[in-house]
């Protein structure tokens, strides 16, 4: 049976429509392909290309029918494409999917369809068709970007969270590697440095774990070569203040919970020999309630092992006298002997840095808006285990760089200056941001608002804004922008908290928000915080919300003055 060509084109048209609906209305986190894929990010080129294919197939379908002229078919197809594009935007708005009714996308749809439909007219009306085509091509050149480059953002996260960055900590120059990469990105964007080579140096004390990290529980006085060692990062980690030990061997001494309630038990423990003190995280949290003499005796133990429900690493500026490990409770199997080796090195005055760049304002360059994110993480634990830190905070750095790319474009040059601050040593206790506040590269009274970006790789459940209950008027403005554009499912205000780099600025009187997304991956300060775990479901929304909020504070491009006046 012979199938006519126009039926084939009709089938292909309907198939393409089904594919478009699937891609535009499927939540990003449920798609089998990463949402960083350009087609799913729906930037201008993607929209135009998708609708160009739709218009071409539709025109061939209608043109194959009897009585349909090429011009009439082109007109019907163009109107249908505009209507279909509008329908998609309405559905995205109602279903809270995709980019939530970015109507600039409809312009891209029309441009793509229009360019393809002009092709059949080139032979008969070449000059007119070329003129219209040139006009359509010129339209996007003056349009401001409406979304981040999600593919580029995901690549940024993947680079920063890669093994080559050594966890962006203080073993094997991890944070210096990350800083070198970010200097290159700032330079490529054409941002002006706020310090030589974008770098503000400072130093800190930090406890590190660069070498051996071994733990084994068995009944033999020797390490058992055929019995697997517990895996660092997966089954145990070093406590941040752990001291070193080489090939230690001791018996476990599980802490009796009666020491917290029975004075006789507490007194008996003051005279008991303690090998490896084994206690739960709940017991450890209550140690300060014990008699001082018993606390001192427990501190003299050969080693500490704390059983925890989840491994959550952190950093410290001090070092205990003995090794202290945190072991996943579900992986702990008590035996008669414990073998351990911990290479711990306390680095004094370790040299590190903040990075600082600026886009100078066109109207009020001495007034500043600040976008900040910390680029450091927890580094390594042993010679092989590293903490990727994809969500914390490669995601925030990626969003900062996307906003920097936006404001670096000449057509988006802000009225106020916009500073981009990449802080080091946040995980060590807000060291980098505190140093900046004490040694500011821009006058703190000239900062109109600071937006700190941290933990922005998810977003299925919206975002929380720390200090939203402090700066209520600014939070209402943020909420109004989010409601108008449906950037994120919801925004939640929170009070002040010393949980990221906004805090030293807030304490110094600088208005500041710290925004982080919720939902999705629960990995935090562990080896599972990897790029593949991040949906980036709220990344584009957080970008749009941050951009619009900063524009409202003074980052919106200044109006071009009429030279005739």
What is the predicted function of each stretch?
Residues 423-520:
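Metal-dependent peptidase/peptidase-like ectodomains
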Residues 404-431, 559:
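Short helix-loop-beta-strand segments that form the rim/entrance of peptidase-like active sites
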Residues 405, 522-565:
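His/Asp/Glu-rich mid-to-C-terminal helical/loop segments that flank catalytic regions of hydrolases
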Residues 141-193, 359-361, 365-366:
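N-terminal hydrophobic or amphipathic helices/low-complexity stretches enriched
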Residues 166-281:
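Noncatalytic luminal/extracellular "stalk/propeptide" segments of secretory-pathway proteins
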């Amino acid at each position: 049976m012979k199938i006519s060509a126009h039926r084939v084109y009709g089938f292909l048209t309907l198939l393409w429509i089904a594919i478009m609906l699937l891609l535009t209305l499927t939540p990003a986190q449920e798609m089998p392909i990463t949402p960083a894929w350009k087609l799913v990010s729906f930037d201008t080129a993607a929209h135009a290309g998708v609708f160009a294919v739709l218009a071409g197939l539709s025109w061939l379908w209608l043109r194959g029918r009897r009585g349909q002229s090429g011009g009439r078919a082109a007109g019907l197809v163009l109107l249908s494409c505009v209507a279909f594009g509008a329908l998609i935007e309405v559905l995205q708005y109602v279903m809270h999917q995709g980019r939530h009714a970015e109507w600039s996308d409809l312009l891209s749809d029309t441009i793509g369809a229009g360019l393809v439909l002009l092709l059949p007219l080139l032979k008969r009306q070449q000059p007119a068709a070329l003129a219209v085509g040139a006009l359509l091509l010129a339209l996007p050149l003056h349009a401001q970007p409406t979304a981040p480059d999600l593919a580029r953002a995901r690549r940024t996260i993947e680079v920063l969270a890669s093994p080559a960055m050594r966890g962006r900590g203080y073993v094997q120059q991890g944070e210096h590697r990350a800083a070198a990469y970010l200097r290159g990105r700032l330079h490529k964007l054409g941002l002006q440095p706020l310090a030589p080579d974008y770098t503000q140096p400072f130093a800190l004390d930090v406890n590190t774990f660069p070498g051996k990290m071994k733990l084994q529980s068995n009944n033999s006085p020797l390490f058992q070569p055929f019995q697997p060692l517990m895996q660092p990062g997966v089954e145990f980690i070093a406590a941040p203040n752990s001291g070193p030990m080489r090939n230690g061997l001791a018996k476990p001494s599980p802490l009796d919970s009666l020491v917290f309630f029975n004075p006789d038990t507490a007194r008996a423990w003051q005279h008991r020999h303690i090998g490896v003190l084994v206690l739960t995280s709940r017991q450890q949290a209550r140690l300060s309630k014990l008699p001082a003499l018993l606390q001192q005796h427990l501190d003299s133990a050969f080693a500490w092992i704390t059983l925890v429900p989840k491994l959550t690493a952190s950093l410290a500026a001090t070092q205990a006298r003995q090794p202290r490990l945190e072991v996943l409770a579900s992986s702990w199997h008590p035996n008669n002997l414990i073998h351990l080796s911990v290479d711990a090195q306390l680095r004094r005055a370790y040299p590190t840095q903040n990075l600082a760049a600026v886009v100078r304002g066109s109207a009020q360059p001495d007034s500043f808006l600040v976008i900040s994110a910390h680029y450091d993480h927890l580094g390594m634990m042993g010679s092989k285990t590293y903490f990727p830190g994809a969500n914390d905070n490669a995601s925030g750095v990626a969003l900062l760089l996307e906003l920097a790319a936006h404001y670096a474009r000449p057509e988006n040059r802000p009225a106020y200056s916009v500073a981009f601050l990449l802080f080091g040593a946040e995980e060590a206790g807000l060291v980098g941001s505190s140093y900046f506040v004490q040694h500011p590269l821009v006058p703190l009274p000239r900062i109109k608002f600071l937006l700190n970006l941290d933990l922005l790789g998810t977003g299925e459940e919206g975002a929380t804004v720390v200090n939203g209950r402090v700066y209520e008027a600014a939070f209402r403005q943020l909420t109004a922008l989010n409601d108008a554009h449906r950037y994120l499912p919801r925004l939640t205000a929170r009070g002040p908290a010393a949980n990221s780099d906004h805090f030293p600025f807030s304490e110094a009187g600088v208005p500041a928000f710290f925004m982080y997304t919720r939902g999705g991956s629960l990995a935090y300060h562990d080896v599972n915080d990897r790029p593949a775990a991040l949906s980036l479901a709220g990344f584009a929304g957080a970008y749009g919300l941050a951009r619009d909020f900063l524009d409202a504070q003074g980052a919106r491009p200044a109006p071009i003055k009429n030279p005739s006046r």
